[in-house]
Amino acid sequence: MSRPNTRNKNKRQRPDAVDSSSQILRKIHEANDVTDDDINQLFMIWKPVCQGCRVNTRDNPNCFCGLVPPLNGSRKSGLWQKTSEIIQSLGPDPTLDRRDSESTPAGLTNLGATCYANSILQCLYMNTAFREGVFSVEVHVLKQNPVLDQIARLFAQLHASQKSFVDSDAFVKTLELDNGVQQDTHEFLTLLLSLLERCLLHSGVKAKTIVQDLFSGSVSHVTTCSKCGRDSEASSKMEDFYALELNVKGLKSLDASLNDYLSLEQLNGDNQYFCGSCNARVDATRCIKLRTLPPVITFQLKRCIFLPKTTAKKKITSSFSFPQVLDMGSRLAESSQNKLTYDLSAVLIHKGSAVNSGHYVAHIKDEKTGLWWEFDDEHVSELGKRPCNEASSSTPQSESNGTASSGNITDGIQSGSSDCRSAIKSEVFSSSDAYMLMYSLRCDKQENQEGQKENPIDITKGEVKQLKGGYLPKHLSEWINNMNAVFLESCKQYNLRKEKELNALTERRQEVRTILSEAAVQSLEEQYFWISTDWLRLWADTTLPPALDNTPLLCSHGKVHASKVNCMKRISELAWIKLESKFNGGPKLGKGDYCRDCLMDGARMVVSSDSYRDRRTFMKSIANDVLSGKCEDGMYYISRAWLQQWIKRKNLDAPTEADAGPTNAITCNHGELMPEQAPGAKRVVVPENFWSFLFEDALKVMSEDTLDCTCFPVDSSQCCHCTEVLSEVACFEDSLRTLKVKQRQNHEKLATGKGIPLTPQSRYFLLPSPWLVQWRIYINMTGKNSSSAPEPERLDGVINTLKCKKHTRLLERLPELVCRRGSYFQKNPSTDKLTIIPELDWKYFCDEWGGLMENGISAFIEVGNTDQSSSPDVIDLEKDSSPDDNMDVDAQQLILRASPEICEECIGERESCELMQKLSYSEGDVFVCFVRGKEAPKAMLEASDSSFEVDRRTSKRSRRTNYGNLTSLKVSATTTVYQLKMMIWELLGVMKENQELHKGSKVIDQESATLADMNIFPGDRLWVRDTEMHEHRDIADELCEKKPGAQDIEEGFRGTLLTGNISSEAC
C-alpha cells in the first residue's frame, strides 16, 4: 500500500485565476460587452469576507486580516510595537533616577575608574560630625578654596538631592584626578585628609580642626636598651597618623594583627642598637606605642605583597575576621580614664584577584538608624544589621586595662584572659576582600528629653535649614533647592509627554481597529470604494500616516485597472467617508469606476496571444526537424546555436527581445555570410515559412540600435575577405606547430623537465629558471590555444639582466650539485634561480631565440682536493647517496665554476635590501610546536631552519608531523618576544618563565627584542619546551600585574592637587 501524499495538505488550493480571467476576457471579446458578472469575476468581488486568516490574502479584495495584530499582540516596529519600546523613544526617564525616600542614601557616579574615591567620600559623608563640620565652613572660605567648595556641594547633594545618585565629575576635575586610572583607597584618604586639613586653616574655630579632631591619632617608635633599660631620645617623639597599617599575611583576625603591630622587635647581632647612655652597641627592643587615638580610627589591611621572583604584586585573599565592637583601652601606652570602646562603622571592600584592577565598594553603618548600607557607585542597597554577607559569630571582648585577649576561637566563643573584669559580647565578621576598616568611638548618650541628638557644632538658625535631621547652610540650601526644582520639573515634563504619547497611541490604535471592523462590504448590491492596499497597510501600522493615495491603482485613462486587483481592497462607504474626511487625498474610486477601454484591449490581447502561441507551437516542431536533419526543403540559413536556444525558451504569448537576430552570429563584419569554419558560425537550413515567422518576430522586437536581421538564402556566398583571413590563420598555426615540434626535438630533456646528468670537465651554460619555465609552457601548448601562449623574451636581454652593470659579473648564486647513484645532478632545479643546461642546448637556443654564443654564462665542473682553497664561485658537492656510491670522491670535491664569476659585492647589497624588506612585514603567521622531552626531533630542527614561503598555502595535513601539530600565531615584525611568549602561554598553557623557545637550534630568550631583531620571518617554524622550573600561575596575574617598565611607572596621584605644593588659598 502506497503512502498518501501529505506534502501539500496544509497549503491552500488556489484556483487557476489566470485561466479563469482569460476565459472571461475571451467572452468579453466575443460579446463586445462587459457585464456586472464579468466585473465581479475579474475584480474578485465575489470572494467572501475573510474571518481570521493568518496573513492578508492579496487576491481577495474583501480580506482585511493581518493588517493589525491580535488584541494582545505586538510588532517589532510601528504603531503596534510594545508600549515600553515606544516610551524609550522619549529618551531617558528622569523619574527612574529619583531617590526612593529621604532615609535612603544617594550613590555617586563612576566616571571610569573612580570607585576608590566614591567609597572614601561616602565614608566621610556618612560620618555625621565630619559632614556637619564641612557644612559649617564659612562662605568666604569656600570661595577661596575650590576643593572645600566642591566637597561641600557634593555633601549637600548627597544630603538633600532628590536624585538617587550624584554626579562626582566636578569634584574629580577640581582635584585633577585621572578618572581612567584606579588608585589605592588608603593613599587617597590620607592625601585628601591632609589637603582638607590645610584648606581649613583659615576657617572658623568650629571647623578649623575637624580633620585632626576626628581622624588623627599619634604613635611613637620606642627603642629600649636591654642593658640600662633607658629609652632612646627619639622614643619621645610622636608621629600623627590617619590610619594604622596592619599586616594580613599569616594573620586571621584584627586582634592578631594589632598584636603583631604592637609587638616587640629584638635588635641583636648585626642589628644592635647604639645606646648613648651605655656608649656602646647593645641589644635592644623596639616597638610601636599608641599615644592617642582619634574618635574615628581607620585600619588599613595590607593585602598587597611583593613577589621577588616575578617582580610583581599579588593580593592576599585569605579570610580575615574583625569584631563589631573593639576595645582599644588596653592598647594605649598610657591608661586612659575614659572608655575607649569603638563600634564598627565602615568596611571598604576590594573585589577582584589582581592588585591594580578590580572594584571598590563600601559597607557603611547609618549612625542614626544603625542599618548597614552597601555603596556600589550609583547603586545603594540596604544590608540590614550586618555589614558582610559572610558568616559571623558572637565573641566576648576584654574590657580590662591589661593586655587584650588573643585566645583561640572555639565554637564562636573567644576565651579571654583571667584578668578580664567584664566582657562585651560582640559579633565577629569575616571577609576575604575587606581592605579598610573604620571604627567610631562609642560616646555617652547625648540625647535630650525629646530624644533628639544635640548638634555638636553650634550653628545659628539663620544660616541653616534642617533636612532629614541634619543641617544645611543657607547658601547650600538655596543651591540644592534650585537643583531639585529643575530635576522635579524635568520629571514632571517627562510624565506629561509620556501620558500624552500613550493617550495618542491608544486613541490611534482604537481608531484603526474601529475602521477595519466597519470596512467589510457585506453584499454585492451595497455601495463600495476601492483603496490602495499599500496605503492601507501604511495607515494601519504608523502613528502619523500620509494623505490617502489611490494613484497607483489608476490606468492611463484615470480609471481602475483590472490588473491592480491584487493591490487594492474593497471597503464600505462608511469606512471610506471616515478615511477621506481625516486624511483627504484620493482619487475617489467607486463601484463603477472600472476602465472599460482597458478591459476591451485586454480581451483583444488574450485572443491575439492564443493565436501566436498556437503558431509558435507549430514552428517548434519544424525547428526540431531542422536540428535532427529531417527537413529537406530548406531555403534560408540561420545560426544553429541561436535556434537551439530558441527551442528551449517557453511558449510565450508574444515575441521577446531574445527573438531578435537569428542570423547575427553568422553575419561577419562586412555584412556577408561568415565562413562556417569561423568560431561560433555553425548554421542550419530552415524552410521558407519558418524563416518568415522568425523574421516577422525579429522585426517586432528589434530596437533602433540593433543590427538588421540579414537574410541569407542557401545560394549565398561566403565572405571572401573572412575566408582569406581564416586561411592565413590556418597557415600560421601550421608553421607554429612545426616550429614547436622541432624545438621539442632539439631540447628533449629540457622540454620534459627531466634531470640532466652532469660530468666533470664538460662545458655547460646557465639560464634563468623563470625563462626556461616560460619557454617550456610555450612549446608544450598545443591545440586551439597554442597561438595564445606568450613567447619568451629574447635571450640577449635576459642574459644581460643576470650581470651587474658595475662589474659585469654574475648577480645570482650558483646552484648546488648532488650525487645520486654515481651520477651528478643539479640539486633543486625547480627552486634554483639558475638552471644548468648542456652546451648543445645553449647553441640551439641562440639560433632559435636570438642569443649570442659568446655572451652566455658558461660553467664547468672541476674535480679538486679538499685542502684546496675555494673561491667564492665554488660550490661543494652534497652527497645524497649511500657511502658505497661515493667511494671515489671521498678525498676530492666537485667545483662548479662560472664565467663571468659571481659578484659578491652586488649580491651582498641586494640580499641586505631583501632581508630588510622581508623583516618589515606588518602581518604574518609563525608556527609553534610544543615539544615534550629534553630535545626536539631532528625533523623539527631541520624544519625550523627553513621558512615557509609567505604566499604558499599549506594544508593542515601538510603541517601535521609525528611530533605534534603546529599552532599558527598572527605576528608582525615589531612583535616582541615577550608578546610572542604571552601568545604561546595563552594557546599552549606553558607559563612564560618556563618557556624554552627555539628557532632551529637557536634559543630565543631576549624578551625585549622584536621578531625582526631575532630574524624570525613569516612562515618560520619555532618549537617550545616546558622547563617546569617555576610554579604554575594564572595568566591573568601576568596581564594585570605586568612589571612596570619605562612606560608603565606607577605615578599614583602625581600631577593632582592631592600632591601639589599649593597654598591654602588654592585648595
Curated annotation (Swiss-Prot):
Residues 390-418 have a biased composition (Polar residues). Expressed in seedlings, roots, stems, leaves and inflorescences. Keywords: Hydrolase, Nucleus, Protease, Repeat, Thiol protease, Ubl conjugation pathway. The keyword Signal does not apply. InterPro entries: DUSP-like_sf (IPR035927), Papain-like_cys_pep_sf (IPR038765), Pept_C19_DUSP (IPR006615), Peptidase_C19 (IPR050164), Peptidase_C19_UCH (IPR001394), Ubiquitin-like_dom (IPR000626), Ubiquitin-like_domsf (IPR029071), Ubl_USP48 (IPR044743). GO terms for molecular function: cysteine-type deubiquitinase activity; cysteine-type endopeptidase activity. GO terms for cellular component: nucleolus. It comes from the Eukaryota. CDD domains: Peptidase_C19L, Ubl_USP48. Residues 106-442 form the USP domain. One of its GO terms (biological process) is proteolysis. Pfam families: DUSP, UCH. Residues 1-22, 385-418 are annotated as: Disordered. Its EC number is 3.4.19.12. Residues 1-12 have a biased composition (Basic residues). Transmembrane segments: none annotated. The active site is at 115 (nucleophile), 359 (proton acceptor). It is found in: Nucleus. Belongs to the peptidase C19 family. This is Ubiquitin carboxyl-terminal hydrolase 26. It comes from Arabidopsis thaliana. The lineage of its organism: Eukaryota, Viridiplantae, Streptophyta, Embryophyta, Tracheophyta.
